[in-house]
């Protein structure tokens, strides 16, 4: 079971408390959505969960792995926080192959897995012969979500997955990530 356990997690930026979570657990199979104002600490929490930011105190465990003390959790976790995760001088195909290679996938396996997202991409991502930097924000969002799911992770962390997506795609996003 791939539970996420948060214990005594704290992060401050100067006098501002960004995250202060005593104890929280997300059970395997659960889906959690965070809602809050801008600056409430949602993205900070995700960055702490992914060890992209050092906590002032406490810990995050994915499975039995403390994310700040081991890299093992990375093989079972997929994430897309923002377009900073993308390598924008690659085409989507090159980027998917790059991500796939990190997880030991062949080009054929990547192609097969990307094909499952065909409806979600709506003919706007693959085969366009352009760099990621030249895509719309919505299509960059799709590329990020697909890349996070490419290796079929047990844990998926997406920050604002509906951001930049046209309303007509939001109904496709949830089934894509579930």
Where does each model-flagged region fall?
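Conserved small/polar residues in nucleotide/adenosyl-binding loops
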Residues: 170-176
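Conserved ABC ATPase "signature" region
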Residues: 97, 101, 109-127
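Conserved ABC transporter NBD signature motif
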Residues: 58-73
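Helix-to-loop junction immediately C-terminal to a conserved catalytic motif
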Residues: 50
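A short, proline-enriched helix->beta-strand linker immediately N-terminal to the Walker B motif
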Residues: 150-154
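A short, flexible loop at the N-terminus of ABC-type nucleotide-binding domains that lies
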Residues: 2-28, 56
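The feature captures the beta-strand-to-loop junction immediately N-terminal to the Walker
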Residues: 35-37
């Amino acid at each position: 079971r791939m539970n996420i356990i948060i214990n005594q997690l704290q992060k401050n930026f100067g006098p501002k408390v960004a995250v202060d979570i005593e104890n929280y657990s997300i059970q395997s199979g659960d889906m959690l959505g965070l809602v809050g104002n801008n600056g409430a600490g949602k993205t900070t929490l995700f960055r702490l969960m992914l060890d992209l930011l050092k906590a002032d105190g406490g810990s995050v465990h994915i499975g039995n792995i403390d994310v700040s003390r081991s890299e093992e959790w990375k093989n079972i976790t997929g994430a897309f926080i923002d377009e900073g995760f993308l390598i924008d001088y690659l085409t989507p195909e090159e980027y998917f192959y790059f991500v796939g290679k990190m997880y030991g996938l062949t080009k054929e396996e990547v192609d097969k897995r990307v094909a499952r997202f065909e409806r979600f991409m709506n003919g706007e991502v693959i085969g366009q012969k352009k760099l990621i930097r030249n895509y719309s924000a919505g299509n960059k969002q799709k590329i990020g979500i697909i890349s996070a799911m490419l290796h079929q992770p047990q844990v998926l962390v997406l920050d604002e997955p509906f951001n930049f997506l046209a309303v007509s795609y939001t109904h496709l996003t949830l089934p894509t990530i579930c």
